[in-house]
Amino acid sequence: MKFSCGFLLIFLVLSAMIATFSEVEATVKCGGCNRKCCAGGCRSGKCINGKCQCYGRSDLNEEFENYQ
C-alpha cells in the first residue's frame, strides 16, 4: 500500500511540474508580441499557436496626417 501511495504521489508531483513548465514556456515565446510588432511600425500583435502574428497597417499614421 505504501509503495502505491508513494508512486501516486511522485506521479502527481511530476505531472504538476510538467504542466507548469509547459505554460511558462508558452508565455515566454509570445511574451513580447506587441513590442515586436511595434518595432516595425505600431501594429497590434497576437500569439497564435505559439507564434507572434502582427495585424494592422504600419503606415496608418502617415495616411491620417496626409488626410488632415
From Swiss-Prot:
Leader sequence residues: 1-26
Disulfide bonds: C30-C38, C33-C54, C37-C47, C42-C52
Locations listed in the record: Secreted
Tissue specificity statement from the Swiss-Prot or TrEMBL entry: Expressed by the venom gland.
Keyword terms: Amidation, Disulfide bond, Ion channel impairing toxin, Knottin, Potassium channel impairing toxin, Secreted, Signal, Toxin, Voltage-gated potassium channel impairing toxin
Propeptide: 57-68
GO molecular function, one term: toxin activity
A GO CC annotation given for this chain: extracellular region
Annotated InterPro entries: Scorpion_toxin-like_sf
Residues modified as Tyrosine amide: Y55
Family the entry assigns: Belongs to the short scorpion toxin superfamily. Potassium channel inhibitor family. Epsilon-KTx 01 subfamily.
Role noted for this protein: Potassium channel blocker. At 3 uM, this toxin blocks voltage-gated potassium channels rKv1.2/KCNA2 (5%), hKv1.3/KCNA3 (10%),rKv1.4/KCNA4 (20%), Kv11/hERG (24%), and Shaker-IR (27%).
UniProt domain comment: The presence of a 'disulfide through disulfide knot' structurally defines this protein as a knottin. Is completely devoid of the classical secondary structure elements (alpha-helix and/or beta-strand).
Other notes: Negative results: does not block voltage-gated potassium channel rKv1.1/KCNA1, rKv1.5/KCNA5, and rKv1.6/KCNA6.
Protein name: Potassium channel toxin epsilon-KTx 1.2
Organism for this UniProt entry: Tityus serrulatus (Brazilian scorpion)
Taxonomic placement: Eukaryota, Metazoa, Ecdysozoa, Arthropoda, Chelicerata
